[in-house]
Design a protein with these regions (language model features):
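Start-of-domain marker
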Residues: 1-36
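Short, ordered, surface-exposed loop/turn motifs in non-cytosolic proteins
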Residues: 7-11, 140-151
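Glycine-centered loop-to-beta-strand initiation motif
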Residues: 31-35, 164-178
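Extracellular Ig-like/FN3 beta-sandwich strand-entry sites
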Residues: 43-47, 128, 177-179
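Beta-strand-rich domain onsets/edges
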Residues: 68-131, 136-141, 153-155, 192-213
Length: 213
């Protein structure tokens, strides 16, 4: 479900904890490990939100970039590109983690990020086996988009792929004692000004949502 990492402030654009009543910014220290450390005093359902600044990536080869496009079902969206040049990319992450000490206080976030997955139901409701979510780009639902679901229990790892409906919504069946990571990627070609500023051919946005059932 990813590798542990230390906190590095220049990567951060925003970091905050949200519940049904308030939003709390979370200042951290460089080098903190685990990267995010905070004491949650309020009871109920919380969402940890982390947004990064742009970071730079150069692919190892054109083939690696093609593999990425195929894996994320982005080949049609990208179309033709210069295969004589190893692609470069600037990427941002929009990561969320759902947390609770029970099933009270669930709320649905209002979309306000450039790219994000919003939980429409609580995975902690013991009466529900279906988890519903919605994908947004700059406040608008993103339809017919690939969502990749990684999950694991004590013995196995699992992978599932679904598509959002015309309202940007998706749903999956969830199982007890599993950790879930729901992921979506948006990739756009850099315009002339962006290429000059960021030295990148492509810009990507990564939205993730993590919870443990």
């Amino acid at each position: 479900m990813g590798s542990p990492f230390g906190y590095y402030d220049p990567n951060k654009k925003s970091l905050y904890l949200e519940n049904i009543n308030k939003v709390k910014d979370l200042p951290q220290r460089d080098g903190n490990f685990p990267a995010i450390q905070t004491l949650i005093l309020d009871k109920g359902f919380h969402i940890l939100n982390y947004e990064t600044n742009y970071e730079f990536l150069k692919y190892e080869s054109v083939e690696k970039f093609k593999d990425f496009l195929k894996e994320q079902d982005l080949e049609k969206a990208v179309g033709n590109f210069d295969t004589n040049k190893i692609p470069t990319e600037s990427y941002r992450r929009f990561a969320k983690a759902l947390m609770t000490d029970g099933n009270k206080g669930f709320f649905i976030q209002k979309p306000k990020l450039d790219f994000e997955i919003i939980a429409l139901t609580s995975p902690y409701n013991l009466e529900e086996e279906i988890f519903e979510f919605q994908l947004f780009e700059k406040g608008d639902p993103l339809e017919n988009w690939q969502i990749t679901i990684f999950s694991r229990d004590e013995e196995n790892n699992y992978k599932e792929i679904v598509k959002t409906n015309p309202n940007g919504m998706g749903k999956i069946k969830i199982f007890d004692n599993r950790t879930y990571l729901i992921s979506a990627v948006k990739l756009d070609k850099a315009n002339y000004i962006e290429k000059l500023k960021y030295k990148s051919d492509w810009f990507s946005l990564w939205a993730t949502l993590v919870f443990k059932k």
